[in-house]
Amino acid sequence: MAGQSPPLAPGEHKFPWRSAGLRYHAYNFFLRQKFGQRVQKVSLDAGFTCPNVDGTVAIGGCTFCDNRSFSPSRRTPRLSIQNQLDDGIRRLKTRYTADRFLAYFQPATNTYAPVEKLRPLYEAALAHPQVVGLAIGTRPDCVPDDRHLVLGDFRET
């Protein structure tokens, strides 16, 4: 029949992650396949807040999200994105022997700012020669259409 794939050889899987013994397509597996090596996240603090912190929705933050618990050093005076990346990469390279990194905008809601502020921050992170992508921590109610468009500008086809 036209358009059908050829039959698989014995022991061959339709999905390469199955051949690796995985039960699902893990993001780590995808990154290793795409870049040929380990890719590690570098946590960045761009100084964002959250509608549950600044009073727009509530005050005091969410009960499940205490940024101090997972990034205590990041809530101190901030370095530039470039300096945070350089510092984080230096630490992670020795710990994980990684050479490629995701810029992880971690604490708070990292789409909770005007597009004019977001774009240069994301561009600065992607300009680093060892950064291969972005990971952006946010809330689903803080990604309006204009933020979708900005994020779409950074996608790789």
Regions found by a protein language model. Give the residues of each.
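Short intrinsically disordered, low-complexity coil segments enriched in acidic
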Residues: M1-A2, T157
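N-terminal [4Fe-4S]-dependent radical SAM core
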Residues: A2-T63, N67-D99
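Broad structural signal for hydrophobic residues in well-ordered alpha-helices, predominantly aliphatic
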Residues: L31, L92, A125, L151-F154
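Structural recognition of alpha->loop->beta junctions
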Residues: C62, Y122-V131
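Distinct, well-ordered alpha-helical segments
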Residues: V115-E123, P144-F154
